[in-house]
Amino acid sequence: MISFIKGVLIEKDPTALLIDVNGIGYEVFVPMTTFYTLGDIDSQVSLYTHFVVREDAQQLYGFKSKVDKKVFQELIKVNGIGARTAIAILSGMDSKTLLHCIENKDYALLATVPGIGKKTAERLVVEIYDKLLKMANEIYAQTSGTTTTSQDSQAQQAPTSAVLANSIFNESVDALLALGYKQKDAEKMSRSAMGDATTAAEVIRKALQGSIRSKR
């Protein structure tokens, strides 16, 4: 069991990282809420991890905090919710927002996540309600807000060229597709979130937040 990983960030793409640990490269899948907190390539990274073994694959999932890891582990215990859907949930909302959804039985908001319909949302609330409430103190104790990465800080620099804008748009679409959104929806969400953003992380974050707000 691999429960924690610390190493050098070699590659950094939305939802997937490559981390060098003493010369061995580990592919780690992460929710966007963790991706936003990462530093630059070649920087040190430390993540709490959950190792999933299937017949056709072995995958490592990483999280910025032990609490997020625990929430992920509870999510994948719910019938009908696999690791990919759990990652999509924690990409569209942080643990605090998820707790609010569970407490308020906000099925409509949960159903905005790709792969979750109304019935699955209802089952999720029933199966995870007590467990998540027991974790409430841990969840609320987490530092609010998102750590600003060096990539985000670069957003105040030179205007985005057409080529860079296209690259950012495509990267955002690819990330949303990886989270389970349909091509048409991923393109629409990315286009609406572009604005004056100069990094794909900005666009993805705005796209996911916009999707949540539109359902409230």
From Swiss-Prot:
Protein name: Holliday junction branch migration complex subunit RuvA
Function as written in the Swiss-Prot or TrEMBL entry: The RuvA-RuvB-RuvC complex processes Holliday junction (HJ) DNA during genetic recombination and DNA repair, while the RuvA-RuvB complex plays an important role in the rescue of blocked DNA replication forks via replication fork reversal (RFR). RuvA specifically binds to HJ cruciform DNA, conferring on it an open structure. The RuvB hexamer acts as an ATP-dependent pump, pulling dsDNA into and through the RuvAB complex. HJ branch migration allows RuvC to scan DNA until it finds its consensus sequence, where it cleaves and resolves the cruciform DNA.
Region Domain II, annotated ranges: 65-143
A molecular-function term among this protein's GO annotations: four-way junction helicase activity
Presence of the UniProt keyword Transport in the record: no
Organism the protein comes from: Francisella tularensis subsp. novicida (strain U112)
Region feature Domain I, mapped onto this chain: 1-64
Region (Flexible linker): 144-163
Top-level taxon in the UniProt lineage: Bacteria
Entry keyword Cytoplasm: yes
Principal cellular location given in the protein's record: cytoplasm
The protein's assembly and partners: Homotetramer. Forms an RuvA(8)-RuvB(12)-Holliday junction (HJ) complex. HJ DNA is sandwiched between 2 RuvA tetramers; dsDNA enters through RuvA and exits via RuvB. An RuvB hexamer assembles on each DNA strand where it exits the tetramer. Each RuvB hexamer is contacted by two RuvA subunits (via domain III) on 2 adjacent RuvB subunits; this complex drives branch migration. In the full resolvosome a probable DNA-RuvA(4)-RuvB(12)-RuvC(2) complex forms which resolves the HJ.
Region annotation Domain III: where it falls in the sequence: 164-216
Keywords: Cytoplasm, DNA damage, DNA recombination, DNA repair, DNA-binding
Domain comment as written in the entry: Has three domains with a flexible linker between the domains II and III and assumes an 'L' shape. Domain III is highly mobile and contacts RuvB.
Family, as annotated: Belongs to the RuvA family.
One cellular-component annotation, GO: Holliday junction helicase complex
